[in-house]
Amino acid sequence: MEDFVRQCFNPMIVELAEKTMKEYGEDPKIETNKFAAICTHLEVCFMYSDFHFIDERGESIIVESGDPNALLKHRFEIIEGRDRAMAWTVVNSICNTTGVDKPKFLPDLYDYKENRFTEIGVTRREIHIYYLEKANKIKSEKTHIHIFSFTGEEMATKADYTLDEESRARIKTRLFTIRQEMASRGLWDSFVSPREAKRQLKKDLKSQGPCVGLPTKVSHLTSPALKTLEPMWMDSNRTAALRASFLKCRKK
């Protein structure tokens, strides 16, 4: 799993995930499933933010060209991925500036258009159960919750999905990609089931090679939120080709 993570995700995302785990005394080389989950969550948070800006009229717009415009500001403030001290500093600054209530737990994003903190979830389990767990933990109607699953489902507070359909589809396609690449290497079952993960760890199973013809390398171009991978889900033709390649994967 560790090899898969380092190959599938941009190095800067991997580095952030490693720092996050070490801050809590966890070892990415041992808790590899958590390592993969944190990288996935980080990437979804960055994708959620990418290309979304607020214009001079306060309207939300999407800009993908990278053409600089001084009148535009990022719609989302990314809190996830920062060390705890810096993250709380950012949260306190937002609360002092906007007047919103300070959340009890660190959220993932702040939405300047809707003036609310946002909690992003990525689950391998039943989405409704995971959503309720998040809601019960946060216990605040003022923090917006948006959950994505690896099966293409999503659930959000009051069915308010915040982003346009295309932006959400990019996230779902990326999660689909991650799931299929894990499955092609025999890693998906252990990622979903902790019991299976322990069994594989005891047997010291090695990861299988990637599916023939399946892209496993990422480009390292700069995105608006982070120097993250160039999204291969951006182009519908490439997405269709990618899905077709999954169907042709040979089971070993």
Swiss-Prot record:
Record flagged with keyword Mitochondrion: no
Keywords, ordered alphabetically: Decay of host mRNAs by virus, Eukaryotic host gene expression shutoff by virus, Host cytoplasm, Host gene expression shutoff by virus, Host mRNA suppression by virus, Host nucleus, Host-virus interaction
Any one GO biological process: viral RNA genome replication
Positions of the catalytic residues: E80, D108
Site (Important for efficient shutoff activity): K202, K203, K206
Residues under site feature: Important for efficient shutoff activity and nuclear localization: R195, K198, R199
One Gene Ontology MF term: RNA binding
Location relative to the cell: Host cytoplasm; Host nucleus
Record carries keyword Lipid metabolism: no
Family label: Belongs to the influenza viruses PA-X family.
Function: Plays a major role in the shutoff of the host protein expression by cleaving mRNAs probably via an endonuclease activity. This host shutoff allows the virus to escape from the host antiviral response. Hijacks host RNA splicing machinery to selectively target host RNAs containing introns for destruction. This may explain the preferential degradation of RNAs that have undergone co- or post-transcriptional processing.
Domain notes: The probable endonuclease active site in the N-terminus and the basic amino acid cluster in the C-terminus are important for the shutoff activity. The C-terminus acts as a nuclear localization signal. The C-terminus is recruited to host protein complexes involved in nuclear Pol II RNA processing.
Protein name: Protein PA-X
